[in-house]
Amino acid sequence: MHTLDNGLRVAVEPQPWNPGLSFTILVPVGATSDPEERLGAASMLETWLWKGAGPRGARAFADALDALGVRRQSGAGVEYTTFSASLLPEGFSAALELYADLLMRPHLPDDAFESVRALALQELAALEDQPPRKLLVRLRREAFASPHGQPVEGERETLERMTPEALRGEYRRRYGAGGSVLAVSGGVDPDEVLRIAEKHLGAWSGDAPSPPAVRLTVPHRFHIEQETEQVQIGLFYKDVPPGHYDFYASRLAVAVLSGGMSSRLFTEVREKRGLVYAVSASPGSVKGFGYLTAYAGTMPERAQATLEVMEEEIERLAQGVTREELDRAKVGVRADLVLSGESSRARAGALARDLFILDRARSLEEVEAEVMDVTLERLNAFLAGRPYRDPWIGSLGTVEVGP
Amino acid sequence: MSVLTFREATLPNGLRVIAEINREAKSTALGYFVRTGSRDELAGEEGVSHFLEHMVFKGTERRSAWDVNREFDEMGAKYNAFTNEELTVFYGAVLPEFAPRLLDLLSDLMRPALREDEFETERKVILEEIALYRDRPHFVLYERAQEAYFGRHPLAKPVLGTTESIEAMTRAQMAAYHARRYVPNNMTLAFAGNLDWDEMLALAERMTRGWTRGAAPRNHPGFTPEPRRLRTPYDKASQAYAVFVAPGHAAAAEERYAARVLADVLGDPDNGRLFWRLVDPGLVETAMAYHHEYEELGTFLVYLQGDPAHEEEVSARVREELQRLEKRGVEAEELERAKLKTATSLVFAGETSLSRLFYLGMGYSYTGRYEALDTVRRWVMHLEPYHLGELLEARPFSRALEYWLVPADHG
């Protein structure tokens, strides 16, 4: 990792065998830094940025990226906005110059503002047609008392009240090199990457506001009444944060719970009882805090039973896991690491997130060594000493699940 | 770039075995590509292909359902299966040291026990899966448009079947379907990544020795699209969803490269013509086009999702763009951009063994030939505007079906 004078952090992981290259630019602009009266600002800004930058209008800008063969993805999330690109190495400098225009010299034109707003409103409305996502957005909102619960999509009122001036103000206040990250992976030379990053992004100024501290509500239940076929069930548990001594133990515990198809949740909820098509638990984290969410979708008459089995299985972790379960969890994590190491896009994304969350980038070898280092005794001591219990519980559908 | 070798063999029982070998790859991917899907189902069998795909993981003579799940996880395998109208695919990726064990497991699974108790449990899972998709309007739209476009053609059948067909399905029906379709001469075993060809081929031969050949016929009735506009209110939709389905080109047709690039020019999600006419001005949230290839025919699909208030305006603009494309064709610059983007995508499709396996297995299942990603790239890079013009001469979009799924209060 290298930090430019303006505070931009750069990480490079060469993949000498790879004929391609991917990069991710992470800017700490997300729902957590949206002011309460401007929820959805980070998301709208990301769309607006693409409406022209530097010497080019929106169309010429898209054409210029296409002319380099750039495959791209971008979007705002809870804590940050990412801009990812995959292309051939010879186009890297020209592509980064275009992204520098986007970040440092966007036009943010008045005449595109209404269409940006219309898109944001449609994105928000589309959430109604995605019951699992709608429930998980609300679950986060119920669990966090701090801005980490704020909806990325914003709210109807805040989107309708947004003005071009206010949104430009958000751009000036929150987009900057300080706190941002550039991560590159693929067939590249690290020195060359640094030289190119310095050339195009070295003059980027500004600092991002520092992330807010995490605060939680008191665990509770909630229900969203909606006419759906399946009832959606979501659980939220506190977990250890990234960087914590027990972090890798917690990751292995989640793998035992929901890693492969021999994992506990899949076996007990789906394979033995046929209660669901989808059931899963996944680890989540924001800077300085870790959590575990579990999800299932099932028909109303089976919702209560599904919730009970899920809660029971998650609490039962406190009694420990077997050696066979730990072995399977470890080999699964190891395979995931090797397979993700084949993809430049996956690596660039992971490096960028590491720099944001941990302030340093972990190599695949380091993660593997840490995972392999967790013994059965250590994992079971962790589970006994810090049991997963007392979750926030939410449901969405035609029946409410309860105690 | 790493050196790739292609190998192929046909076993005495008719099973085709193919491999794209890269001795420097860090993983090995392998899979069975069975030429069977919803289009091969007889009356009363609707959904059996997909239900059987689930049952394949529920145990064999040698293994219980638990054994199967446990063994995959002991290898740390990244694995799954999918079913569509024409293919059922079982695949996995592992570290190279586990490849023989994964082959043993997947091969054994191709001869499932179909135990009665597992059948009943899994029936419930399938019914949940059908319920899950009813909560997703874009999927409902796709299924209904497919049915409307294909009419009496077997490609009209829903892959998941229906609640009724799944509730009525018997184990005997599934066993009969399996015996008819999972015959070795109707299957391809494909490998990609780091592997020892001789070892794998010998193991495959040993594992599949008892499999016997069968006919596995497939109907290819004639088909003529019937252009029209349909519209259905759906009580679980709050946004409007639409597709335009137009005649395209088959999976083995030479025109497929030009057809894919033509779809990109029209509906690339970042910079296609529809993006600038519809998404940029904020009329819809999503506008995309792609080319979908089947065995004897193909379709162009335009997909739209957005505010129901704009339905008429959106419909008119899409039809205008389709007409303009048919009348004036594509410009050289936009073709160059679309070609370059496709070429880059192919480089990234080659990064992982699993992604290579899909290209290899799907391509071979349809064409019976190996097509390296680099060969595809060459075909694409040599396209000229007249290649796309030739496809447009048949005026495919004038024969499009337009299907809207709208919120109930817009019905």
Report each predicted region and the residues it spans.
Chain B
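A short local loop/turn or secondary-structure capping micro-motif enriched for an aromatic residue
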Residues: 26-28, 99, 252
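M16/MPP (pitrilysin/insulinase) zinc-metallopeptidase core fold and M16-derived inactive scaffolds
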Residues: 24, 29-93, 265-283, 296
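Acidic, glycine-rich loop-and-beta core segments that form the ion-binding/anion-interacting portion
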Residues: 225, 237-239, 244-245
